[in-house]
Regions:
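C-terminal beta-strand-rich structural cap/linker in extracellular carbohydrate-active enzymes
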Residues: 30, 75-76, 633-662
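C-terminal low-complexity, Ser/Thr- and acidic/Pro-rich disordered "stalk" regions positioned immediately N-terminal
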Residues: 657-690
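Conserved alpha/beta catalytic core and glycan-binding cleft of carbohydrate-active enzymes
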Residues: 110, 343-344, 352-507, 513, ...
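Substrate-binding/active-site clefts of carbohydrate-active enzymes
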Residues: 142-321, 331-350, 354, 365
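A cross-kingdom C-terminal cell-surface attachment/processing module
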Residues: 695-717
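Glycan-recognition and catalytic regions of carbohydrate-active enzymes
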Residues: 436, 496, 500-513, 534-598
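Short proline/glycine-enriched turn/loop motifs at strand-loop junctions of beta-rich domains
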Residues: 30-35, 605-606, 615-616
């Protein structure tokens, strides 16, 4: 079938329903079909079970293409294809549908220009100079606003509109919630869990209790209808999704989509398989569908038309919806060449688009490990900006995610110093790290820091707060808070790209009705998954600590260097004799930082430890209570005593006293206006600023969400595919 791909290079052969005011051209790739017809169902979205009003025979073209052109303004007309294969007629929703009806069972012709909100053509992305300037906040549409204390208007709760509504506070207070909280916190980017049309929510029964993360895709090029104000009208979800992106951009926040191209929610009766049986999915040695996703199937990205489908879809979202980045679910199931092509095509649109993903699979796959986009193969991207999640730093901070009671550096484990150091240098090559002692590997896997996503928690597994409590059931809340603060301090002072789970900043917890912690809440009720905004008040100290760390990172380039060479030259670990103690210095003079020398110390022991710093006289800006860019204390001499379970960041007194803000970073200093998310800095090493295509650092961060996702995803996704 690969020969069919050649014809599709022709611009004329644009798959899907191609609308114009006076006609619409329908094009489907179905090379094994003996007959294809176009079924038209009228323009009533509420009449979603009616029989076809008109059925038209399509013409067979070259190389598997079927097409028909129908005159008239068909905007809003629902349609499907009737595909005959081996004498059986399959009703197929267009794999390239740009709009659908309720539950995604019928495609809809759409005039996309009519879905643009006012001012869409002038939508401006918040500036991003370097990928490492990103601060990513992972959230779920429903979780973010469904809580009774979110302050969001009732009809907007759990919807696209609830994400961007401004002026919201916890009722009866001035404590900010929603998008205003994000602006106050200082994040640059929201990563939104799957928002293209998925199977698990019945959009005709939204008055019943339903919940799902959405990792069971049905229609790749259409927003999910359950988050819209009207899932029956195909145009509404599109317009409201665009409004969400536009308003987030106005708030200085970029948008990353969590995309699930590695599998589909259905297999035998998926749109793809009904159109071209067995082509879109890999098979195992027994001839059945392979299951590297843990969800019943896995797409074959190495096949030309599957690769085309994925690349076309990503490009479509980037262009039509102004998306700023893509996080690839189970990226390890995609082949390296597909990921490279995605990066190349996105660079043609906007080099600042991030790409990152999970550098693992959810089970065994027939795709060769040499060709797979797994974490270990990140080096094969050269200097492309395709990033993977660092399970190294995640598990080094808090313990293995698949062993709930296993601790690590911050919560009582021993022997994780080198793993933390490996995370600090963004999993890049560094002679100061003893790779034989790194928990999850023995060598560097990233060529550049912008290829690494650092995090302590994500939607999978226990929340950070719940993990810390589980590993230390007898610890006081004050002790757990210190562990949480150190976890955050490690993430936000490490090189690479920082990432956090929504609510982590105020001790997010997921508690089941029986009082146990939920480690796989993919379909748990709102009571488990919602962002509990009252915790922002209860844990205001922790929230302010995160806010201060973000301010520190955004204000000082030393914490977000652009290249491995910069890290090797300007980050020096301090030799310490004590266990559970990591210390290092940063030379800011070579990376455009107003602070000449910075020292960072993590003392995970239950007692104070003394560290001798190079040079004398230091100013403390981060301690066990506060974080930021303001003076907390002054240290005379070179010896500093770090309290138990405490992180310290110190600055040499002379450069601190100069009172200058990081060169080129003035606009980064957090403020109440939307400019607090403008990222500026040293551009000298930003591939997007050079003409050298070989060193391009594609900013479509393929967030390889690291973590041994095999277990998590097998569990999560088997549950999704019944």
């Amino acid at each position: 079938m690969e020969r069919f791909f050649r014809s599709l290079k022709n611009e004329w052969v644009t798959l899907g329903a191609n609308y114009s005011k006076d006609k619409t051209r329908f094009v489907l790739w179905a090379p094994t079909a003996t007959e294809v017809k176009l079924a038209l169902y009228g323009k009533s979205g509420s009449n979603y079970t009616n029989s076809a009003e008109e059925v038209l025979a399509m013409t067979k073209g070259e190389n598997g293409i079927w097409y028909i052109e129908k005159a008239g303004d068909l905007n809003g007309l629902y349609y499907n294809y009737l595909v005959t294969i081996d004498g059986k007629v399959n009703e197929v929703t267009d794999p390239y549908a740009k709009a659908v009806g309720v539950n995604g069972n019928r495609g809809m012709v759409i005039d996309l220009a009519s879905t643009n909100p006012e001012g869409w053509e002038n939508d401006t992305k918040p500036e991003l100079v370097d990928p490492t300037d990103s601060i990513i906040y992972e959230m779920h549409i429903r979780d973010f606003s469904i809580d009774e204390n979110s302050g969001v208007t009732l009809e907007y709760k759990g919807k696209y509109n609830g994400v961007w509504q401004s002026g919201t506070t916890i009722p009866g207070s001035d404590v900010k919630t929603g998008v205003d909280h994000l602006k106050e916190l200082g994040v640059t980017t929201v990563h939104i869990l799957p928002t293209f049309d998925h199977r698990s929510i019945d959009e005709t029964k939204l008055d019943t209790k339903q919940y799902n993360w959405g990792y069971d895709p049905q229609n790749y090029n259409v927003p999910e209808g359950s988050y819209s104000s009207d899932p029956y009208a195909g145009e509404i979800r599109i317009k409201e999704f665009k409004e969400m992106v536009q308003e987030l951009h106005k708030s200085g926040i970029r948008v990353v989509m969590d995309v699930v191209y590695n599998h589909t929610g259905a297999t035998l009766d998926s749109n793809l398989n009904l159109a071209v049986p067995d082509y879109y999915y890999r098979q195992n040695s027994q001839g059945g569908f392979s299951n590297g996703s843990g969800c019943g199937n896995e797409t074959a990205s190495e096949r030309s038309m599957v690769r085309k489908l994925i690349v076309d879809s990503v490009v479509y979202w980037a262009k039509e919806y102004h998306i700023d980045g893509f996080r690839f679910d189970l990226m390890g199931l995609h082949d390296i060449d597909t990921m490279k092509e995605i990066r190349t095509e996105l660079d043609k649109i906007d080099r600042t688009i991030l790409i990152y993903g999970e550098g693992w699979t959810g089970g065994d796959s027939p795709l060769s490990s040499e060709d797979a986009a797994i974490k270990a193969n990140t080096t094969k991207y050269g200097n492309m900006q395709i990033a993977a999640f660092s399970d190294d730093i995640r598990d080094g901070i808090k313990g293995h995610v698949f062993s709930a009671t296993a601790p690590a550096f911050v919560n009582g484990g021993e022997g994780f110093e080198e793993t933390i150091k490996f995370g600090i240098v963004a999993a890049t090559e560094n002679s100061q790290v003893d790779y034989s002692k790194v928990a999850n590997g023995t060598k560097a896997w990233a060529n550049q820091p912008y290829q690494t996503i650092n995090y302590a928690s994500a939607h999978d597994n226990l929340t950070l707060w719940d993990k810390l409590q589980t590993t230390n059931p007898n610890a006081s809340e004050e002790e757990v808070l210190l562990m949480n603060k150190m976890s955050a301090a490690i993430v936000y002072t490490s090189q690479g790209i920082p990432f956090m789970q929504a609510g982590e900043e105020f001790a997010r917890t997921k508690i089941n009705p029986d009082g146990s912690f939920n480690e796989n809440s993919y379909n748990a009720p709102d009571s488990v998954n919602k962002i509990d905004w009252k915790r922002k008040v209860e844990y205001s100290d922790l929230n302010n600590y995160y806010k201060g760390l973000i301010s520190l990172r955004k204000s000082h380039k030393s914490f977000r260097m652009n290249t491995t060479e910069d890290i090797q030259n300007n980050l020096k670990f301090i030799d310490v004799e004590d266990k559970n103690l990591v210390a290092y210095t940063l030379d800011g003079t070579n990376v455009g930082d107003s602070w000449d020398n910075i020292a960072v110390v993590f003392n995970a022991n239950n007692e104070a430890k003394e560290v001798t710093l190079p040079g004398e006289d230091w100013v403390v800006v981060v301690d066990q209570n506060n974080a930021g860019i303001e003076k907390l204390a002054t240290i005379e001499g070179s010896k500093v005593t770090i309290p138990a379970q405490t992180s310290y960041v110190l600055v040499d007194k002379s450069s601190f006293d100069e009172g200058e803000i990081d060169n080129g970073e003035d606009s980064d200093k957090p403020s109440e206006d939307t400019d607090n998310n403008k990222v500026e800095g040293n551009n000298s090493s930003n591939p997007s600023k050079t003409g050298d295509e070989t060193s391009v650092l594609p900013i479509v961060i393929i967030l390889l969400v690291s973590g041994l996702a095999v277990g998590v995803f097998a569990k999560k996704k088997r549950s999704l595919s019944k």
